[in-house]
């Protein structure tokens, strides 16, 4: 019962956030659609973000390349057509990120924290996933996100 009420409250705030927030990065705003997401952490807290959606192959190849500042409570959600092991890199990405690998049910599968800017090192999901969420470095520690937590959109 408490968990159900917690989820309803989180969804209410997600709706409120989506209706009120606007992002300042015109370039990303023009190239990507936006959506609000809510992260429900195991510590019973809800965190709200507005993310750009990388849905097409070209958008996924571009990602957050050349972005020099990621505003607080923003990020990018990569949406793939199917679940499989995914590989990411940081080529031409000037800021360190936390990468969250998410399965088809919205459950956090694994997290790669504090990625190295502009690195060509491959960062792979540990299991088949359908989504990757990129947030500013340190965000996952700040919201106490762990494997098994749930992300809603």
Model-based region annotation:
Residues 2-9:
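Bacterial N-terminal signal peptides that target proteins for export
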Residues 10-18:
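Bacterial N-terminal signal peptides
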Residues 23-153:
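Compact, glycine-rich, soluble single-domain proteins
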């Amino acid at each position: 019962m408490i968990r159900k009420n917690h989820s309803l409250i989180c969804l209410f705030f997600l709706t409120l956030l989506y209706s009120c927030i606007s992002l300042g990065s015109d370039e990303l705003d023009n190239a990507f659609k936006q959506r609000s997401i809510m992260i429900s952490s195991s510590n019973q807290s809800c965190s709200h973000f507005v993310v750009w959606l990388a849905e097409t192959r070209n958008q996924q190849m571009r990602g957050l390349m050349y972005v020099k500042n990621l505003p607080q409570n923003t990020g990018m959600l990569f949406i793939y057509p199917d679940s499989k092991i995914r590989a990411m890199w940081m080529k031409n990405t000037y800021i360190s990120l936390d990468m969250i690998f998410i399965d088809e049910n919205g459950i956090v599968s694994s997290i790669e924290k504090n990625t190295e800017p502009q690195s060509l090192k491959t960062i792979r999901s540990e299991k088949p996933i359908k989504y990757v969420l990129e947030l500013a470095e340190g965000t996952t520690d700040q919201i106490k996100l762990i494997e098994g937590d749930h992300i809603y959109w």
